[in-house]
Amino acid sequence: MNLKKLLQKGILPLATLLVAGTLSVSCSKDNEAFRPTPEARPAEPKVPPVKKSIGAATHKIVVNTEKGPGEKVKLLIYARETERSDVFIDWNNNGTYDEDTDDLVTKFERDYTKGASYTEYELKGRDFAVCGKVIRFAIMDEKIKGVDLSGNTLVKALALAGTKTLTLTGLDLSRQTDLRELLLQSVVLPSLNVSQNTALERLVISKTPLTNINLNNNVKLKSLLLNSNKFTSLDVSKNVALEVFACAGNQLTSLDVTKNVALQQFACTRNKIRTLDVTKNTELVLLYVGVNSLTTLDISKNTKVKDFDAGSNQLTSLDFSRLTQLEEVQVTDNRLTALDFRSNPNMKLVACSLNRISSAAYTQLINGLKVNTEGLILVFSEAANEQNEISDAQVTKLRSEKKWKVFKQKADGTIMQTTVGNQ
């Protein structure tokens, strides 16, 4: 059985748009009435072929790499259809288009979350510029040293991702005041300032060494994914428009989400949080708080929750009676003595191994479950610290009467189906 995890990549899918841009050169014929007669026509000098003319670039993004000529870099470039004819890669970064050396951009993609959206370009130097009115730009490469956006204030979406680790000395976004989306993944940089990016709606930062970030000015944020960093504290009190918030895998000891009343999905797993108030988050559909240090959790106001994970805490009780839309519960490795699902008719997944559920309490749990041929339940572990007690007869009832598939976890962590209990 594969227990689901929330937003492992810290990114949500976006629509993809692929439009090929074309360039053409047209030549007009001379008016026949004004042509001299053959006898009077002077010899015409040889004129070199007309080249595509693009004026000096008024907008550009300058990239500095550790790679050399002949090596390749993956870029995603997007401009509005009416602006595409002047978008090119300036390989010598001189600000003008040279048909002999520079590349016109003919592939425009929006979705930086898909590897197939990126185009591989062959470098002709270490520094190059992406010129034109580009509004979405992304790089997938670990050998980028710097990205200078000061020459393009139109950028609305920026994504920088290293296939391993991308190290930058800094990233200045102060002029990108209309930036709506920012993704930094596997990027090492000393700090990040997004205080000028007040239009931000989506911010994804993952696998970085960042320890703090100021989000007070980013009041339009709707999606905030900050998984797998080094944050020791986060203040989201001003981000009242948030609908999706994930901060798994950091070093948080406390977190206040009482002002984030619009939240629909929230995950703070793999931190060190001791107390958490989610009573104001009444719109939550997904709530993941596993692998923390919680001893109590009031979920009585989270009546819309369908997917709940509080595994690996120190919880002694949980009341699901008001969560009538609940479908999936993962509460392994706690100190729970009982679970009651009589008020939860839509249950289809329960993982409750490594608790202290007695045989009598298991009877109550089983009786509360509705018949479900797609139901999956993890009832005990073979680990030495397992204190759940479930009999062969109870497993049989789960399988035969309730039609659930019953699983156990072996000492090595492997999960497999079982037809017998541990008592």
Residue ranges and their predicted role:
Residues 10, 81, 182:
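A short catalytic or substrate-binding loop motif that flags glycine-/basic-rich loops and adjacent residues
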Residues 1-25:
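Sec-dependent bacterial lipoprotein signal peptides
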Residues 27-166, 172-177, 196-198, 219, ...:
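N-terminal capping/linker segments that flank leucine-rich repeat
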Residues 138-143, 159-167, 183-189, 199-209, ...:
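Concave beta-strand-loop units of leucine-rich repeat
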